């Protein structure tokens, strides 16, 4: 049994021999969203020598120039705006050797209707450029998420399914760009014989990417670093249900492993799967872990005194600039590394748990210890000098 089905924390931190002779690759990946929280893990894991059907040749696509924290990955980096069909056609259609597409990106708009339009267009642009031009294209992995079962953020109070959330639950009666993406995927794969697909639905992701719009661990690290700098208590910015109730999460490396499994295992084709760590935790316990990692006083949930990170952090830009200067950190702006709105949603609501039974029934036995996962990603945020 390979390491990615054994749940090894940090297994992807192996290094590739830079003097290794060039080889002919049977597997060629296109990662769309390579600087995202899962795309970054895919870029680290796919090129490893013991990855199934690997090592892989990897193309990585992102809108912005390549960041320094992504430079060690042995991939071909392509800066491309996938909302721009002309840019996509020019830069992606020449990649005729691609065998697998890992689509792990999204864009945020002010309404779900606009989310559907923009995110649908992005996916369609990529598939229109790749499917007709890649004769050996075998499989497309589409990453969506648990909002498939819960609804869009703007519809957060609609009637939802009763957990545990299973893959066979019907769609909610509301707009959801995940549904738009799935429909586009199902339509486009029909255009090429034997082309298969998989859909992956993680929960709250623990991982590393300063560019991610939904980076909970990185955001909490920034919050804790500011509390440490100011000598403040690490107050819990959430609700009682999140503090006392059971939560789960999805390790970014585990999600990457899950997608690779679905891409190469015949028994995982043409299916949608949940992907979470396989255990549960309480934020009141993880809050102590976070406080210990930064040497700050741990706060508690305060009944009737709920706070939001968006409010606590709204004037902290100059404080963050000072922390960056004094500690020689990578140059970042607070608004780039602090996803306060997302953290407030996660910690301001009870967690709706899913189940991994379907993945296990189809042969994926990967898991993570969520506490160890949390600590390992905090360590990585520190190692790349995002926080002191």
UniProtKB/Swiss-Prot annotation:
Q: Give the gene name.
A: ISY1
State one molecular function term (GO): oxidoreductase activity, acting on the CH-CH group of donors
Its EC number(s) = 1.3.1.122
Enzyme class comes to oxidoreductase
**Domain of life, per lineage:** Eukaryota
What is the originating organism of this protein?
A: Nepeta racemosa (Catmint)
Pfam families (alphabetical)? PRISE
Identify the catalytic residues. 147, 178
This protein is called: (S)-8-oxocitronellyl enol synthase ISY1
Which terms are listed as keywords in the entry?
Answer: NAD, NADP, Oxidoreductase
């Amino acid at each position: 049994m390979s390491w990615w089905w054994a749940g090894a924390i940090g297994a992807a931190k192996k290094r590739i021999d830079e003097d290794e002779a060039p080889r002919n690759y049977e597997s060629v990946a296109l990662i769309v969203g390579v600087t995202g929280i899962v795309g970054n893990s895919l870029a680290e894991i796919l090129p490893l020598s013991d990855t199934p059907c690997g090592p892989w040749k990897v193309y990585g696509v992102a809108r912005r120039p390549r960041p320094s924290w992504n430079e060690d990955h042995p991939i071909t980096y392509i800066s491309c705006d996938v909302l721009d069909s002309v840019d996509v056609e020019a830069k992606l259609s020449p990649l005729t050797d691609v065998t697998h597409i890992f689509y792990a990106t999204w864009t945020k708009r002010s309404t779900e209707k606009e989310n559907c339009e923009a995110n649908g267009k992005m996916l369609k642009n990529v598939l229109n450029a790749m499917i007709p031009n890649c004769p050996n294209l075998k499989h497309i992995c589409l990453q969506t998420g648990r909002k498939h079962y819960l609804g869009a953020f703007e519809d957060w109070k609609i009637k939802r399914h009763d957990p545990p959330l299973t893959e066979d639950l019907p769609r909610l009666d509301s707009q959801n760009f995940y549904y738009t993406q799935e429909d586009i995927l199902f339509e486009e794969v029909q255009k090429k014989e034997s082309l298969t697909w998989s859909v992956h639905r993680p929960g709250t992701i623990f991982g590393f990417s300063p560019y991610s719009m939904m980076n909970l661990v990185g955001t909490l690290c920034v919050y804790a670093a500011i509390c440490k700098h100011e000598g403040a208590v690490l107050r819990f910015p959430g609700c009682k249900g999140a503090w006392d109730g059971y939560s789960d999460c999805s390790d970014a490396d585990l999600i990457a492993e899950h997608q690779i499994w679905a891409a190469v295992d015949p028994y995982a084709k043409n299916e949608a799967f949940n992907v979470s760590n396989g255990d549960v935790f309480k934020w009141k316990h993880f809050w102590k872990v976070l406080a210990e990692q930064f040497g700050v006083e741990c706060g508690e949930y305060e009944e009737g005194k709920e706070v939001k990170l968006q409010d606590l952090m709204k004037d902290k830009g100059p404080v963050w600039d000072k922390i960056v200067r004094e500690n020689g950190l990578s140059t970042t702006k607070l608004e780039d590394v602090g996803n306060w709105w997302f953290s407030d949603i996660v910690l301001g609501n009870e967690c709706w748990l899913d189940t991994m039974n379907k993945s296990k029934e189809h042969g994926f036995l990967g898991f993570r210890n969520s506490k160890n996962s949390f600590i390992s990603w905090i360590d990585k945020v520190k190692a790349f000098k995002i926080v002191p």
